[in-house]
Regions:
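Flavin (primarily FAD) cofactor-binding/catalytic cores of flavoenzymes
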Residues: 1-59, 103-631, 638
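Redox-cofactor-proximal catalytic regions of oxidoreductases
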Residues: 47-104, 587
């Protein structure tokens, strides 16, 4: 037995940091391989442990999760294939029913619960994990930030905290989530111009932290972003200020009754349209999609390739298109068998036989459809305003409102919607894309294409609850929201004394306001990080940025040199998540998990899903076992 406890610091105690804590306590616990090993686990989290920044239990009660209650969990279950001891705990639904019966009475698995409720559940889960740890495991909470890390004697690490504490530990796990970013040059210039002219600019960031109180009732506000952050901030600015939605509008649509305290929002985004609604059927959980083309064998073929030799658009995208297109046409012909000149089985066979040609802009069955509008055209879905121009914002708004109502109809009857069938397929392939990315086989240029696909997939398959789209349409009808169009160019007009926005989507005068709300969350980019810990790691050489291999294979394929393309990630070994130093050497005792490694892994912000062999728990277990294995304590040393 060692003379002193094994020391581990976990930086960040949101869902991922909490998962690492749970896996550490399980592997150190009575049934684990490191049973009876004294340990001290330091949890560094300035916010509520378990909930972290995103799931703050004190955030506005109006904000909803974008996933359904039946999918949410903080604990592994018996579907999780991991080496460590099997443990379990209540899902969100089970917690609400058995441990907090008054927290969400009547909550159903298919409903989208409140984000604050999820935060309270995660905080409870963290407390339960802490309480149930074996008596020889000491868990110490540090309600502050980590600001620096360096080497200490005996191969240990010294973690410096913002309150002046210095922790000397055997291993550190970085689970920091979304940290603050410095503005990109163009955004910094816009913010500086706004300050010079006394304008209100709310920069991009976490929606619950935005100073929305600075936006005055009736004041015009330009808004950039129509994705998930937008819907959160829209809710706070409307129903959060006393407005009400009544379910007595035409065709059962909601009608908005303003409180008079709302600002007037003029919103636009890159696409110019909001994310599409998630399916939402009363009394039924969302149905999944069974993979046919982008299956395990396809993943195995791609991941067996040499680093940097797989082109995303040439080799991965065709598999995605085949999967989504087949789902589209299968549903189309189930709902409208007469839509094609061929029988359904023959058309689907022809589509499947086309192979990789489905991803290069040609549709192998288009000539057999009576109506060109029935084609599966992913690029048209991605650019819905391409080639369209409207006389003014009023004409565009009427068109967009009708589009939202059509999307709502599809979301409420997804089994009859080719679009929602394709969306389910796109959601299903994301796990396959994650495996390909983690293998390090994509070419450097593919990472730009991968960034595009992430945006496209989010727009199609990871949108808000359908109820939020219904509310947005009602807010448009009530005159609270107006739409500017695609790619609005925002500048500061010194003569006019305000922001000015122009979009090629609409003719007529530009949109003007003295306030600008950036309703989006910047992607993780190590080069722009404002986090002193991450920046210090790179500056000291303990860590390095990740670069992807170039098309010629001359890049690092998961490293930091050789002429590759920077992905914005902290460089780690894909398999065990050990941080690589400036020379590319994996550090034995420093690990990173989740958002900071977006680029080495993909879609890292996704949460754990119950009964789905969640990757988050598998990675947390692998990290915990590597941490314990890297110390001088071994399972056979007891």
């Amino acid at each position: 037995m060692t003379a002193r406890p094994v020391g581990v610091a976990v930086v960040g105690a949101g869902p991922r940091g909490t998962a690492v804590l749970e896996r550490l306590t399980a592997n150190l616990g009575p049934s684990g391989p490191w049973a009876d090993t004294p340990a001290e686990v330091h949890i560094v989290e300035p916010r509520t442990p378990g909930a972290g920044r995103v799931w703050d239990p004190g955030q506005p009660e109006q904000l909803l999760m974008n996933t359904v209650a039946g999918h949410a969990t903080a604990f592994p279950d018996d579907t999780v294939r991991m080496a460590g001891p099997a443990t379990t705990g209540p899902t969100l639904m089970e917690w609400a029913r058995d441990h907090a019966p008054g927290a969400a009475p009547g909550l159903q698995p298919w409903e989208h619960p409140r984000r604050a409720l999820m935060g309270r559940y995660l905080a409870w889960a963290h407390e339960r994990i802490t309480r149930s740890a074996a008596p020889y495991i000491r868990i110490v909470a540090h309600p502050t930030r980590a600001i620096g890390l360096d080497e200490a004697p005996e191969g240990r690490l010294r973690l410096r905290l913002d309150d002046g504490t210095a922790l000397v530990v055997d291993a550190v796990v970085l689970a920091t989530g979304h940290t603050d970013q410095r503005p990109a040059p163009r955004e910094g210039e816009l913010a500086a111009a706004a300050r010079r002219h006394g304008l209100t600019h709310l920069p991009p960031g976490h929606p619950a932290e935005a100073r929305l109180d600075l936006l005055q009732p009736g004041e015009p506000v330009l808004v950039r972003g129509l994705a998930l952050n937008f819907f959160d901030q829209l809710t706070v600015l409307t129903s959060g200020r006393g407005g009400r939605f009544e379910q007595d509008g035409p065709a059962g649509r909601p009608r908005y009754l303003p409180s008079g305290r709302e600002p007037r929002l003029l919103a636009g985004s890159g696409r110019g349209v909001p994310y599409l609604a998630r399916p939402q059927v009363q009394g039924r959980m969302p149905t999944g999609h069974s993979l046919r083309f982008f299956d395990a064998a396809a993943v195995e073929r791609l991941t067996a390739r040499e680093p940097g030799t797989v082109g995303f658009m040439a080799e991965v995208w065709p598999l995605i298109v085949r999967e989504a297109g087949a789902a589209w046409y299968r549903t189309l012909l189930e709902v409208r068998p007469g839509a094609a000149r061929l029988p359904a089985a023959a058309l689907l066979d022809r589509y499947a036989a086309a192979g990789d040609r489905t991803g290069v802009g040609t549709d192998p069955v288009a000539e057999h459809l009576y109506d060109p509008a029935d084609r599966f055209d992913p690029f048209a879905l991605d650019r819905p305003l391409e080639g369209r121009r409207f006389r003014d914002r009023a004409e565009f708004g009427a068109w967009l409102a009708e589009r939202m109502y059509e999307d709502l109809d599809a979301a409420r009857a997804p089994e009859r919607s080719p679009l929602k069938a394709a969306a389910a397929a796109i959601a299903a392939v994301k796990g396959q894309v994650r495996r390909v990315v983690a293998a390090g086989v994509l070419s450097g240029s593919s990472y730009r294409e991968l960034s595009w696909f992430r945006s496209f997939g989010a727009h199609i398959a990871s949108g808000p609850p359908a109820s939020r789209i219904a509310e947005l349409a009602a807010l448009y009808e009530a005159g609270v929201v107006e739409f500017m169009g695609a790619r609005p160019a925002v500048t500061v007009d010194a003569a006019a004394g305000g922001f000015v926005a122009m979009s090629a989507t609409t003719d007529g005068p530009p949109a003007t306001a003295r306030a600008l709300l950036d309703a989006w969350l910047p992607g993780a980019d190590l080069a722009l990080s404002a986090d002193p810990l991450l920046r210090g790691l790179v500056a000291s050489g303990l860590a390095r940025p990740h670069t992807a291999a170039s098309n010629s294979g001359s890049g690092s394929g998961g490293g930091g040199g050789g002429g590759g393309i920077a992905t914005g990630a902290l460089d780690v070994c894909p398999s065990d998540l050990r941080v690589r130093d400036a020379a590319g050497r994996p550090h034995l005792r420093l690990f990173a998990f989740g958002v900071p490694v977006e680029g080495v892994h993909w879609n890292t912000a996704i949460g754990a899903r119950a009964r789905a062999n969640a990757e988050m728990f598998r990675q947390a277990d692998a990290i915990a076992r590597s941490v314990l294995g890297a110390t001088r304590v071994r399972p056979d040393s007891r």
